[in-house]
Amino acid sequence: MAAATSPPRAERKRWGGGRLPGARRGSAGLAKKCPFSLELAEGGPTGGALYAPIGPPGVPGPSSPAAPAASPAAADLGPRPRVSLDPRVSIYSARRPLLARTHIQGRVYNFLERPTGWKCFVYHFAVFLIVLVCLIFSVLSTIEQYVALATGTLFWMEIVLVVFFGTEYAVRLWSAGCRSKYVGIWGRLRFARKPISIIDLIVVVASMVVLCVGSKGQVFATSAIRGIRFLQILRMLHVDRQGGTWRLLGSVVFIHRQELITTLYIGFLGLIFSSYFVYLAEKDAVNESGQVEFGSYADALWWGVVTVTTIGYGDKVPQTWVGKTIASCFSVFAISFFALPAGILGSGFALKVQQKQRQKHFNRQIPAAASLIQTAWRCYAAENPDSSTWKIYVRKPSRSQALLSPSPKPKKSVMVKKKKFKLDKDNGLSPGEKMLAVPQITCDLASEEQRPDHFSVDGCDNSVKKSPTLLEVSTAQFTRTNSFAEDLDLEGETLLTPITHVSQLREHHRATIKVIRRMQYFVAKKKFQQARKPYDVRDVIEQYSQGHLNLMVRIKELQRRLDQSIGRPALFISSSEKVKDRGSNTIGARLNRVEDKVTQLDQRLELITDMLQQLLSLHRGGTPGSRAPGGGGAQVAQPCSGGSINPELFLPSNALPTYEQLTVPGRGPEEGS
């Protein structure tokens, strides 16, 4: 079966079963350098165009007339595999390409110099344990009762470590070539001049010298090379090759340099003065043994350092009460300043950790913000009729489609790569059986109207032949290898024509793209809001307090605007304040003025009515106080001063009344109608 589907290895190698050289330089280079050419085989059952390889001279190909007679059984196995037009992919081999040398260098360099992941952690932690065990045995070799045990074991451990560190140094030097600044001999020398590389080289050379000079397996036999033992302790620096510890310490010291300098300066002044005054008080004092403990200023400085650093050896003690008083006073003052740098550094480290956490939280917001900006811009650009807005949704025609389609009409194919891979994976088919199990169908847009049912026999490719071991396909019955839902999904993907130009986009395409972009915008907005959520309780409290402060400011501003527009409520202001507030332009003051005017108009209307009634009664000659002839029981008001009209009633008054005059007194029952 396998022999029938693929040519032999020797024949494959001879007739170009591997890469297709020269394909990147056009079809001319492909025709010159490739042992076989690609011929367009037309007249298939579906009218589609397929490329089939033409074999070497004397070997019948798929288009040769002798092909059906050469192997009848092979003709029933199904269609031949399509020839890939990608020059980087082999026709008969699907093996992964070999990793490039620079790629391997980069992976090794990242593994050694930029450790990330659990594998790197395990490796570097194992190296740390080995170095720590070697250091412990080095310490035990200096103890007399463990010399015999530790020295022999240490000798072999030193040999293993020298070989290991030497090999690792060479590998590091080789893998550094993946970076542009370390390429070549001068680049390697630049890498070797790094401080940590120099330390590694010194450790390897020192260990080699110790092993070479040592005799009879004794690592530290001679006293001449015992000084090199310190260089072997430098292996502990190998643990932190990236120098993150020193960078962190340096950044903390640099940030708090002013506070550290201040405390150290004042503490140093306290040390000098306290030592000097104690020396003056104790320079002639003699202890119980008859010796002068503070015979020089250097002895006093030593006592001061031991005292202010809270060590207290007790080798020098003040003898006089004057010296003890001076020592106690200055000790309290100086010890407090010498203890401050530890607290400053501790708080600096805590702030640094918090700053890194904030930076991590902020870095998580950057991709979300970028995605939100991008989606917002795309939503805005969707309203622009420019063609560049829609080019990202247009599929570029591949080189294989350009070669397979001689006519300008586009073709549709069932071979959807992702769906095919999923179906093959679900069915558990081997690579040699995939081409037999999945039918290859090509659809022509010109005959799309006359196309029968998609699930009928005529709608499938007749090139699917039966296989005695996989499935039986006859012309009268169609055998399904997939579920109905998968066939529907496959049908939905096959009926979609790829858009190759912006002009092919229709209004429903553009509307769908706008809807998708708007949905992407809402999703990106939600993710950005989730990324901006605070991660600490203190941040939550700070955010709430800041929000409460902003809310109070807004409420006060709103209250001020309401007071300016409406005015203060009448229940909370006195009469004098109302008088003062009447001249303002608030709504309340305007309403008060309107009410005053309405009251004044009401009074004038009543006055005019009384005057008209008096004039009417005088004109008719009636007695004062008599009823009007019209009846109605209304009594006419009597004229003032014996029939004369008060002229003050006709005087116009434009002056506004006071607030106390605004209230009209209620009429009694006798003043009614």
UniProtKB/Swiss-Prot annotation:
One of its GO terms (molecular function) is outward rectifier potassium channel activity. It is a multi-pass membrane protein. Residues 66-75 have a biased composition (Low complexity). It is found in: Cell membrane; Cytoplasmic vesicle membrane; Early endosome; Membrane raft. It comes from the Eukaryota. A 1,2-diacyl-sn-glycero-3-phospho-(1D-myo-inositol-4,5-bisphosphate) binds at Q242. Keywords: Calmodulin-binding, Cell membrane, Cytoplasmic vesicle, Endoplasmic reticulum, Endosome, Glycoprotein, Ion channel, Ion transport, Membrane, Phosphoprotein, Potassium, Potassium channel, Potassium transport, Transmembrane, Transmembrane helix, Transport, Ubl conjugation, Voltage-gated channel. Each channel subunit contains six transmembrane segments (S1-S6) with S1-S4 forming one voltage sensing domain (VSD) and S5-S6 contributing to form one quarter of an interlocking pore-forming domain (PD). The segment S6 is involved in the inhibition of voltage-gated potassium channel activity by KCNE4. This is Potassium voltage-gated channel subfamily KQT member 1.
